[in-house]
Amino acid sequence: MREKVVSLAQDLIHRSSISPNDEGCQKIIAERLEKLGFQIEWMPFNDTLNLWAKHGTSEPVIAFAGHTDVVPTGDENQWSSPPFSAEIIDGMLYGRGAADMKGSLAAMIVAAEEYVKANPNHKGIIALLITSDEEAAAKDGTIRVVETLMTRDEKITYCMVGEPSSAKNLGDVVKNGRRGSITGNLYIQGIQGHVAYPHLAENPIHKAALFLQELTTYQWDKGNEFFPPTSLQIANIHAGTGSNNVIPAELYIQFNLRYCTEVTDEIIKQKVAEMLEKHNLKYRIEWNLSGNPFLTKPGKLLDSITSAIEETIGITPKAETGGGTSDGRFIALMGAEVVEFGPLNSTIHKVNECVSVEDLGKCGEIYHKMLVNLLDS
């Protein structure tokens, strides 16, 4: 299986699919799946290409989810080999997307192919949900496919997202949930004036100082058995004209919260508004909700992937919910059990992104055993 996975991964890496461009990756995948009898449905939205492929006719529906888009390469001169050459050096496959996530995407596809070849009349439905809009806006990708499926009353029972979840060794971590993410873009109004005549102006930075202290020290919650406490970080602050003798007219503050299931986005919005009113600030705020938290509690999917990892590499993975958001947050809206598993994440988005070819082969075996555990038991 390793050779098949690595070969497909190289084919995908060769295509410079900077988000939201697909550059023919999904066509390669669709042609392979179609030969095995998968039903292929294209779901393009604006400049994003999405693929929904399925094999079988009855529940449960087991979906593999992934993305063909990648982040920009950065300075290509810093790479040991060209970022889209997909070279193998000392057992490592190098290239943009090798770990995030064309390698695991290839492993999921080969696993599905091998299972269908051996079990053409399998029970359940094996599906693949693939998008080219995960690394950037994530507005026309998985969420649009999910919305389409929901309007048709189609179900996903279990979903494996192939994000690179492993930390130090393949299989040491699986993600069974993610925190929510919400960003506030806050504009605090003042009155511009000369710094020598502060009584004729109103400095929004000074006015906001106590509010910022409260915002950054407030304890939102203590977390729970599945999630760490909610975290707030200020990402950007800007005010002033660049001159040292002008009191600014406005202060811009951008902050982000990664929040657990102990709070909601509405609770966060309400509390921030209370703080702003408490400090008598003139303001306007724009909120951007990237996704609510989701959690897959111990059950059939988590048991199946845990068992598959134990059988293949002999370790028991730890289920965690840390890290950034993923498209799993959209699929969870369908009521599906969602788990993320993939190769090591230590080089993702970096120069010289790479993945072990041995690990890619193991990923394919693990995904295949997961299918066996879910459909043959």
Curated annotation (Swiss-Prot):
Catalytic activity of the protein: N-succinyl-(2S,6S)-2,6-diaminopimelate + H2O = (2S,6S)-2,6-diaminopimelate + succinate
Domain of life: Bacteria
Cofactors demanded by this protein: Zn(2+); Co(2+)
Key word Hydrolase present: yes
SUPFAM superfamilies found in the cross-reference section: Bacterial exopeptidase dimerisation domain (SSF55031), Zn-dependent exopeptidases (SSF53187)
Pathway per the UniProt entry: Amino-acid biosynthesis; L-lysine biosynthesis via DAP pathway; LL-2,6-diaminopimelate from (S)-tetrahydrodipicolinate (succinylase route): step 3/3
PROSITE patterns: ARGE_DAPE_CPG2_1
Catalytic EC class: hydrolase
Active-site residues annotated for this sequence: 69, 134 (proton acceptor)
HAMAP family tied to this protein: DapE
Residues reported to bind Zn(2+) 1: 67, 100, 163
Subunit structure comment from the entry: Homodimer.
Protein name: Succinyl-diaminopimelate desuccinylase
Annotated organism of origin: Haemophilus influenzae (strain PittGG)
Cofactor comment: Binds 2 Zn(2+) or Co(2+) ions per subunit.
Disulfide-linked positions: none
EC number: 3.5.1.18
GO molecular function: acetylornithine deacetylase activity; cobalt ion binding; succinyl-diaminopimelate desuccinylase activity; zinc ion binding
Binding annotation for Zn(2+) 2: 100, 135, 349
Its biological purpose: Catalyzes the hydrolysis of N-succinyl-L,L-diaminopimelic acid (SDAP), forming succinate and LL-2,6-diaminopimelate (DAP), an intermediate involved in the bacterial biosynthesis of lysine and meso-diaminopimelic acid, an essential component of bacterial cell walls.
Family (UniProt): Belongs to the peptidase M20A family. DapE subfamily.
Record bears the keyword Metal-binding: yes
GO biological process: diaminopimelate biosynthetic process; L-arginine biosynthetic process; lysine biosynthetic process via diaminopimelate
Keywords: Amino-acid biosynthesis, Cobalt, Diaminopimelate biosynthesis, Hydrolase, Lysine biosynthesis, Metal-binding, Zinc
